[in-house]
Amino acid sequence: MTVISVEKMREADRYTIAKGTPSKELMRRAAQGVFDAYPGWDERRVLIACGPGNNGGDGYALAEIMKDAGLDVTLLRVSEKFSEDGEFYYRRCVEKGVPVLTFGTDDVDFSAYPIIVDCMLGTGFTGEPKGPVAAVISEINIARELNGAYVISVDINSGMNGDTGESELAVVSDLTVSIGYYKTGFFEEPAQKLIGALVNVDIGIELPEEQG
């Protein structure tokens, strides 16, 4: 089992892309890995909460995969911003008719979704979540505690520090699907109250020091 820091993960991402793997392909692989990691997708409604960066992009790519599989998936945009790759997959979702809600504009009944996927803040986030993201984190945690929603965090629980496991406010998950490599923060004491099951999916990201 390989465990690396957030900065090492960034370096590995850059290295893999520089060697010729397109970033959109890595995002697609991440989404497919999340889809394959959870065997419980069924006819139940799924809400995917997406933030502004590549973590949100993973959510958009996952929504496309789920739509293609005939599943009942809805996107929740928590930010008006996109990463370049995220916007690419968002547009594909819209073209395929995936329902899209915008937090703060549309009414969102979190209790209506038995499965909620957290794709808001990635491993690069530090500090305390603010604004709509903080509000959605709280709503997800309430839905899990009071309504029994099954919560899946993609790559990391939104709000958690990837190196230390610490958080001011973070999503509590039933399953966290790490992408590429486990991050050091997952195994620190503060993270234990946030993470239920933990799995990692290999999407072909190479560590620079492995090359010689």
Question: PLM ranges: what are they?
Answer:
Residues 22, 102-104, 109, 161, ...:
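Short, solvent-exposed coil/turn linker segments
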Residues 4-7, 21-33, 57, 84, ...:
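Conserved active-site and cofactor/substrate-binding residues in soluble primary-metabolism enzymes
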